Amino acid sequence: MAASGESGTSGGGGSTEEAFMTFYSEVKQIEKRDSVLTSKNQIERLTRPGSSYFNLNPFEVLQIDPEVTDEEIKKRFRQLSILVHPDKNQDDADRAQKAFEAVDKAYKLLLDQEQKKRALDVIQAGKEYVEHTVKERKKQLKKEGKPTIVEEDDPELFKQAVYKQTMKLFAELEIKRKEREAKEMHERKRQREEEIEAQEKAKREREWQKNFEESRDGRVDSWRNFQANTKGKKEKKNRTFLRPPKVKMEQRE
């Protein structure tokens, strides 16, 4: 009975210890999560070198899982926007403004269901790529007769791999978007230059035609004046040199 009692106490103690460790682990996770919920840390995170690419993932900006509800997204936005608002961080207003803009942009993007779906598709593509890569590596290890153990078997390392691949995909899409915009802008500029050139050409042609018509009218008037003057001179000349007929003197016998 004593042995049984000791065993029960031991078992109960083990269960209590496991519960305590679970509770302690949860507390540490909460402390870790809350440790970044300071204005300074959030501004630093959102404006660190490379943030222009890190912040392309709206879920990463708001530090939320892709599966969260719209209500949780709104709650997180309010929380972060207050932390990084420039009015609250006047000693670091410029960076606070950049951080606030990143949070605001991510929030608005996730409110748009179409853009949210695109972001989710990128994240899913990153996850599928890592899963495929891990599968191929395991297949190769098995073929070589080696243990089929890879780093990504660790859930945390798998998560990190997905994060890196997802960030890479977001960056590639952003680069392509900028290239497409630059190309479109160049095309619009080229078309505008052609329109301006066509307008200037048409203007030059109109001016030439106008000048030609005016000069033609002038030439016609000059020719008419010339003809009139010439005719007048001829008539005057004819009148000047007109000689009366000779009168034959009558001879008397």
UniProtKB/Swiss-Prot annotation:
Residues 232-253 are annotated as: Essential for polyglutamine aggregation suppression. Keywords: Acetylation, Chaperone, Nucleus, Phosphoprotein. It is found in: Nucleus. The keyword Chaperone applies. The modification Phosphoserine is found at S35, S222. Ubiquitous. Residues 231-240 have a biased composition (Basic residues). It comes from the Eukaryota. The modification N6-acetyllysine is found at K146. Gene3D superfamilies: DnaJ domain. PANTHER family: DNAJ HOMOLOG SUBFAMILY C MEMBER 8, DNAJ HOMOLOG SUBFAMILY C MEMBER 8/LIPOPOLYSACCHARIDE SPECIFIC RESPONSE-7-RELATED. Interacts with SRPK1. Interacts with HSP70 (HSPA1A or HSPA1B). This is DnaJ homolog subfamily C member 8. It comes from Homo sapiens.
